[in-house]
Amino acid sequence: MTATPAHHAATAISVVPMPARLGAEILGVDLRQRPDADTFAHILDALHRHGVIFLRGQSLTPEQLAVFSTCFGELDIHHMTEHVFPHLPQVRVLSNVKKDGKSIGITKGGMHWHSDLSYKPQPALVTLLYAVECPPTGADTQFADMYAAFADLPEAKRKKLQSLRAVHDRNYRYSELYPGRPPLTPEQVAKVPPVEHPLVRVHPATGRPALFV
């Protein structure tokens, strides 16, 4: 399958869809400077159209990453404060690297299929992952197209699911999923009580329904 880049005359941006139906690469953007309104509008449009966007070759400080992230809205501060920058708690470090026998970041973060912060009353609008060091191919970060997962179901199943809700519990099976981590403290548990969400959510910008499980 050949992907045709979409060029935007007003900016230097090109959007190149991935061969699969999920994801696109954005070219011609340097995130060291906060993008202007027109440039960000193209970035946001690409995200809405393709679900996942990639901007390769960036060289960012944590502060620059946070500044770009604020283009999408107010940043969340995670209820677990390990491995964050003291002056920038909105940015968490995930890593399998150890220094002096200690992990320099969260290990095995999100090793099961999940949607970030689904356990909060207002789930995350978007997650930004800045890869500092990664293998040339493969690796463990994967994405699932939940628009397609819903659309590919039989009509009767789609109709049934649209009437159902599910409980999202941050603390459910935590110790089983993360046996190498200390158990959650009572304070951490209290910060994220179980919440309910529809099994099918409609994206506020695109109007497209997606499974949310």
Per-region residue spans from a language model:
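Non-heme Fe(II) oxygenase catalytic core, chiefly the N-lobe of the double-stranded beta-helix
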Residues: T2-V213
